[in-house]
Amino acid sequence: MSAPLTLALSKGRIFEETVPLLAAAGVTVAEDPETSRKLILPTTDPNLRVIVVRATDVPTYVEYGAADFGVAGKDVLLEHGGGGLYQPIDLNIARCRMSVAVPAGFDYANAVRQGARLRVATKYVETAREHFAAKGVHVDLIKLYGSMELAPLVGLADAIVDLVSSGGTLKANNLVEVEEIMPISSRLVVNQAALKLKRAALKPFLDAFERASLGSGA
């Protein structure tokens, strides 16, 4: 009997919104990662198991073949670079946007017009660098791993680049969204070698995910 396929998922919104896609393929994950201590979760399909990893690590597990396929946000994939990955499907889940935000009262447009050099805090350094370079905005990028909203409040940065969903966290911290960089959603990523060697085993899942994603994007 061949080894089961391995699907890499991260906890939280991506996991929660992938569950219905798995259900469309007739598969249920046996345990909830929010309550289970296990990092390898069986499913109702003996040919599929789920590993629970950090969102930023999903592309790495898939690239190196530790997982055959996974679900990762466009934001994570842009920072990773996408090497060694096949990205067949935009799943239309975990949708939000990547934006620039500043403290309320800070005249961002004028600062840009004046050619000011801005300090920008973000975990998305590569994407932010490309965005500001394309607009001719001079920035010093400060890499942080969380609590972006704090950086402008304590004088660490003039602005942040972060993911925005409802905007509630920005508002609660007296920040305003001044520029949308791009819409973000999560994508299915597949190890390129697995796609060749395990195509028959992967195909039912890829087909089910594609059908379900078309429905969720409607």
From Swiss-Prot:
InterPro entries assigned: ATP_PRibTrfase_cat, ATP_PRibTrfase_CS, ATP_PRibTrfase_HisG, ATP_PRibTrfase_HisG_short
Cleavable signal peptide: none
GO cellular component assignments: cytoplasm
CDD domains hit by this protein: PBP2_HisGs
Cell wall biogenesis/degradation keyword on record: no
A Pfam family per the record: HisG
Keyword Kinase: no
Domain of life of the native organism: Bacteria
Reactions listed under catalytic activity: 1-(5-phospho-beta-D-ribosyl)-ATP + diphosphate = 5-phospho-alpha-D-ribose 1-diphosphate + ATP
Annotated EC: 2.4.2.17
GO molecular function: ATP binding; ATP phosphoribosyltransferase activity
Main location: cytoplasm
GO biological process, one term: L-histidine biosynthetic process
Pathway the protein contributes to: Amino-acid biosynthesis; L-histidine biosynthesis; L-histidine from 5-phospho-alpha-D-ribose 1-diphosphate: step 1/9
Cellular localisation: Cytoplasm
Keywords (A to Z) from UniProt: Amino-acid biosynthesis, ATP-binding, Cytoplasm, Glycosyltransferase, Histidine biosynthesis, Nucleotide-binding, Transferase
PANTHER family per the UniProt record, alphabetical: ATP PHOSPHORIBOSYLTRANSFERASE (PTHR21403:SF8), ATP PHOSPHORIBOSYLTRANSFERASE ATP-PRTASE (PTHR21403)
Free-text function comment from the UniProt entry: Catalyzes the condensation of ATP and 5-phosphoribose 1-diphosphate to form N'-(5'-phosphoribosyl)-ATP (PR-ATP). Has a crucial role in the pathway because the rate of histidine biosynthesis seems to be controlled primarily by regulation of HisG enzymatic activity.
Quaternary context: Heteromultimer composed of HisG and HisZ subunits.
Domain notes: Lacks the C-terminal regulatory region which is replaced by HisZ.
HAMAP family recorded: HisG_Short (MF_01018)
Entry similarity comment: Belongs to the ATP phosphoribosyltransferase family. Short subfamily.
Name of the protein described by the UniProt record: ATP phosphoribosyltransferase
Recorded name of the encoding gene: hisG
